[in-house]
Amino acid sequence: MKKVAVVGVGETRFTGPQTKTEVELFAEAATEAMAEADLKPQDIKALFIGNALGDFEEGQGMIESYIAENIGCLYVPANRYEGACASASMAVRDAWMWVASGYYDIVLAGGVERAATMGTGLATRTFAMFSDARYEYPAGVTFPAVFAMLTHLYADTYKIPLQKLREQMARVTMQSYKHGSINPKAQFFGKNADITMEKVLGSFVVSTPLTLHDCCPFSDGAAAVVLASEKVAKKLTKKPVYITGTGQASCGPLINQKDYLPRIRARELSSQQAYKIAGITPKDVDLCELHDCFSIASLIASESLGFFEYGKAGEAWEKGEADIGGKVAINPSGGLKSKGHPIGATGAGQVYEVTRQLRGEVEPGRQVPDAKIGMTDTLGGDGGTLVNMILERGW
C-alpha cells in the first residue's frame, strides 16, 4: 500500500447549540483544511463524511451530497458514515484506505454534528438507539448507565474502593478541564481550569456513581482533514503527517465482551491492528486523543490501548503519567470532556489535534514537547465499534 499523509486540517470550535446548519459547519472546517494545503475544491477526488444523528437533528438525510455541492465538489463521489461516536474515524480510515490503494491521490474526510442543538432529552433518547434495539434499548439502557455499571465492575474487578476510584476519575476530569480551558477550539475554553476534586465529586448524580463532571457534553461542531498520497503530499507541505497504521473492530452488544469486561476487547483488537501496521508499540506513542465520554472511560481505554497496567490507570493519573510531560500525554486537547463531543465529528477532531501537535502548532501549555507519534481512539455505542489510528511526523 502507498503511504498516506494528512496535508491539511480544519475545525470549527466545538460549542453548545449553533444556529449554523450542519452543511454550513462542515463547509467552515473543510475550507480551512483545503486552504492549509493550498487546494481548491476541484482538486478533491472524493468525500468521506461522518454524521450520526443528522436525520434527527435537522431532518436531513443524504447529507454527504449536499455537503459536496456546498463546498464546490459538485459531482464528486461522496459517502456518509454512521458508527455512532466513531463515525468520523470510520470516514477518515476509509478515506485512508482509498488513497493507500492508489485509487485516489487527494481526498477530503471528516465529520459534522449538531448534537447540542437537539437538547439533552432528544439527544439522549436518539443516542440510546446506538445500543442493541433487540435487547438493550427496550430495557431502558442509556450510555451514562452503561458506564456507571462499568465503573462498579471496574472497582469490583480490580479491588479498588469505590470512593478511591471516584477520586481517581475526578483527576481525569480535572486534567481534561485544565487542557480544554486553554484550547480556543474547546467547548469549555476559559472554563473550569481550577475546578476542585470536591466540586467534581459533589456535582449532581447522573447515574450513580457518575456525576455531572464525570460526563462529557453534547456538542455542535465539525472537523475535516485532507489526505494525499506521499508523492502529492511532498508537493503540498513541508510538514506531512503520515497515518501509518489503522485498526477497526466491532462486537455488537456489550454482553458479547462479558468475558473481558471492564476491558473493551474490541478496542484491544483494533489498537493491536494499528500498532502492527505502523510497526510500533504503545511505548512509542507520545500522545493519544482517546474516547473519554465519561471519566471512567479514560481509565478503561488507556489500559486497553496498552499504556498502563490493567487496574492501574487511576494511579497513573495521580502520578501525572497521563499528563503532558508524563509517560504518554492523554487528551491534551481537553478530550470529549472539555473540548466537546459533536458525535459524528469527534474522530476527525482527534486527527486535527494530533496533526497540530506533531507539527508543533498547539498553544503554549498544551503542546507535547517534541511529539513524533500520536494516536486516536474512538468508541461507538457501548463498545460496538472501535477505530484507532497512528499518526507520525514525516520530516
Describe the residue ranges of each PLM region.
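Conserved catalytic cysteine-centered active-site region
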Residues: 54-107, 114-146, 190-217, 249-251, ...
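Condensing-enzyme catalytic core mediating Claisen C-C bond formation in acyl metabolism
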Residues: 1-23, 133, 137, 157, ...
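Electropositive phosphate-/nucleotide-binding environments in soluble metabolic enzymes
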Residues: 20-27, 57-61, 89, 141-148, ...
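Active-site-proximal alpha-helical scaffold in enzymes
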Residues: 82-113, 145-183, 225-231, 339-362
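Short hydrophobic alpha-helical module
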Residues: 249, 274-281, 291, 301-308
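Conserved active-site "lid/cap" helical segment
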Residues: 1-86, 94, 154-168, 172, ...
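Beta-strand segments within the central parallel beta-sheet cores of soluble alpha/beta enzyme folds
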Residues: 41-51, 77-83, 107-112, 166-174, ...
